[in-house]
């Protein structure tokens, strides 16, 4: 979808609405009714992207450096970091190009801008799909490690993990290319929304089942040592809180973006929906925030990875 004016984002395939005006306040929609419009300054957007970029580069470097981390689980974590890196990097590139075009520092033909837009769209969409896929893969890997502990190393082997990773990247790039090529079709956007909901349900079911098993295990230990029940209840509450935070962050960071896509299909001309469309950059910013949070949840909690990360940082100095 071609750009119309300097205020259009390059990510026009998934958003045909102008970006927010440079303040937080009430803007008028087509009928003059107030419409809340939140602005994300470019410097803040680029800063968050840079933090995400640095974090995820460090995760990839640490896993690549330490052979002890070349297991299927860490391969999935590495690919999650790589896809998050591409999500933040592609959005930073898009913002930088827009700023240069607006400032007149980059002069090029409309056809070149269109090709660049399509390339960034495919890169962004494929990296987002990969990020969601690897979040699901990490949940599935943990599920197998708990419920099939004795057979885990025969089920989740490194060759199988590598084949699954390669298939995920190829499928994401191919599907993203098709999505961008046929972005005007409602079925394409609905497919993306359904995919997000499927990943959300998959993660919720797996993690809830793991929490239930962990509570049963804690209850068994409590009975074995004849300890009081509140200790088990406390464990259950902590586990439920952790699960709520994990799934809550995922839903809060990704949900608004896919809600935007769903509303584009359901009510593209509705006045209330048009107000939501104006905050598209906020939804992208939430996804960037998720790429910052992912390493904190999945990578930096590993002592082995943190030790390797310190070595990487010391070597870089």
Curated annotation (Swiss-Prot):
Spans within the Cytoplasmic topological domain: 64-72, 141-163, 212-240, 301-317
UniProt topology in membrane: Multi-pass membrane protein
InterPro entries the record matches: GPCR_Rhodpsn (IPR000276), GPCR_Rhodpsn_7TM (IPR017452), Melcrt_ACTH_rcpt (IPR001671), MSH_rcpt (IPR000761)
Chain residues carrying a lipid of type S-palmitoyl cysteine: 315
SMART domains the record matches: 7TM_GPCR_Srsx
Residues glycosylated per entry: 29
Entry GO MF terms: melanocyte-stimulating hormone receptor activity
Membrane-crossing residue ranges in chain numbering: 38-63, 73-93, 119-140, 164-183, 192-211, 241-266, 280-300
Keywords associated with the record: Cell membrane, G-protein coupled receptor, Glycoprotein, Lipoprotein, Membrane, Palmitate, Receptor, Transducer, Transmembrane, Transmembrane helix
Keyword Glycoprotein (UniProt): yes
Topological domain spans for side Extracellular: 1-37, 94-118, 184-191, 267-279
Subcellular location: Cell membrane
GO biological-process terms attached to the record: adenylate cyclase-activating G protein-coupled receptor signaling pathway
Result for mutant: residue 55 to E: In strain: Isolate 3
Keyword Lipoprotein annotated: yes
One matching Pfam family: 7tm_1
Gene Ontology CC annotations of this record: plasma membrane
Function: Receptor for MSH (alpha, beta and gamma) and ACTH. The activity of this receptor is mediated by G proteins which activate adenylate cyclase. Mediates melanogenesis, the production of eumelanin (black/brown) and phaeomelanin (red/yellow), via regulation of cAMP signaling in melanocytes.
Protein family according to the UniProt entry: Belongs to the G-protein coupled receptor 1 family.
Subunit-level organization: Interacts with MGRN1, but does not undergo MGRN1-mediated ubiquitination; this interaction competes with GNAS-binding and thus inhibits agonist-induced cAMP production. Interacts with OPN3; the interaction results in a decrease in MC1R-mediated cAMP signaling and ultimately a decrease in melanin production in melanocytes.
Protein name stated in the entry: Melanocyte-stimulating hormone receptor
Taxonomic placement: Eukaryota, Metazoa, Chordata, Craniata, Vertebrata
